[in-house]
Design a protein with these regions (language model features):
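Catalytic machinery of carbohydrate-active enzymes
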Residues: 1-322
Length: 322
């Protein structure tokens, strides 16, 4: 195609900007939708209506399907397995595919290619690098005299996916004994800021929370020896770069959201206290409710008891033996 445009949630704009071959990015906001729904819809429709030869939608929500239908006469979209929800979408769309909750997100997202007669590579491409960001990170590491390091990413987008403070501190004290620098990464949001002010002061631990842009973090991840931390965007960036990963999972279901192995072209499927495939090790609690797929216990969006049942010593043992 001559040009590829994106329509994304504004919360994902920073990572969307790292994708190659994109001309422009349109955004929508749940906050703006709640404040003035029709104003946002009007602006989006004016921007996309019949502006494209082809539209591809990777989710099955009614709203996103309507955007795809409005953007192009030739539209492809995910639809639900439940025909009571999907019937009208199947009628109106040029092509459709089933969004499979039991398949990895990468596999789901590649399905439109087969509808276009293209062979998909089951490969998670890494984000493009910014030369300026790469130089900035190299200078920062040089000033701190850091040559080899592992990233520890303790935060996530939601509280229910964050490791308990006491357990996190215990893990940091253990990591501090390794003969390699540990860089703690994070952004500037409320969750990250709260973690930043509570970090223990340790000789081999370097706090980079709030100090890197997404472009700089991608470079930092590329230069690292590996990733330790929660199941979040940063983990998937590390997976795309084929880094050694030690991921701490709470209620998130593995079959869709576990780190993708480019070498094996697969991901984790079943819940286990510890499992390793290729360069990836995943830790989960040994509890019958794992993984529930809910937003924390009782779906409260705050706390996941399973995360409090993953031993820092167990995590450290795997890292130390590596």
């Amino acid at each position: 195609p001559e040009a590829i445009d994106l329509l994304v949630n504004i919360d994902t704009l920073s990572i969307a900007k790292t994708l190659p071959n994109v001309r422009q990015i349109h955004t929508f906001s749940y906050k703006e939708k709640n404040e003035n729904k029709f104003n946002q819809e009007r602006k989006i429709i004016n921007k996309i209506y019949r502006k494209y030869d082809l539209s591809i939608n990777l989710t099955s929500s009614d709203r996103s399907v309507i955007y795809a239908l409005l953007a192009s006469k030739k539209s492809i979209s995910a639809v639900e397995k439940n025909n009571l929800k999907a019937w009208w979408k199947k009628i109106l769309l040029k092509y459709h595919f089933t969004y499979d909750l039991n398949s990895h997100i990468l596999i789901n997202n590649l399905k439109p290619l087969s509808l276009l007669g293209l062979n998909a590579l089951n490969h998670q491409a890494s984000p493009k690098l910014s030369e300026i960001a790469y130089s900035t990170i190299q200078d920062k590491l040089r000033k701190l005299k850091i040559t080899k390091f592992i990233i520890f990413h303790p935060s996530a987008q939601y509280n229910y996916k964050v490791y308990d403070k006491k357990l996190r501190d215990d893990l940091l004290y253990l990591l501090n004994t390794l003969n390699i620098s540990i860089i703690i990464s994070g952004g500037k949001n409320e969750i990250d800021t709260k973690i930043k002010v509570s970090l223990p002061k340790l000789t081999n631990i370097y706090d980079f929370i709030g100090d890197t842009s997404i472009d700089e973090y991608i470079c930092l991840s590329l230069l690292s020896e590996g990733y330790i931390g929660m199941d979040t965007l940063n983990m998937h960036i590390a997976a795309s770069q084929n880094k050694r990963i030690f991921a701490i999972f709470g209620p998130t279901k593995l079959n869709m959201w576990s780190p993708w192995s480019n070498n094996l072209q697969t991901s984790a499927i079943e819940a286990k206290p510890i499992q390793t495939y290729d360069n990836i090790t995943i830790f989960q609690a040994d509890m019958p409710c794992v993984a529930c797929g809910e937003k924390g216990c009782k779906n409260n969006g705050l706390v996941s008891e399973c995360l409090s049942n993953i031993s820092p010593s167990l995590i450290f043992k795997e890292i130390e033996e590596w």
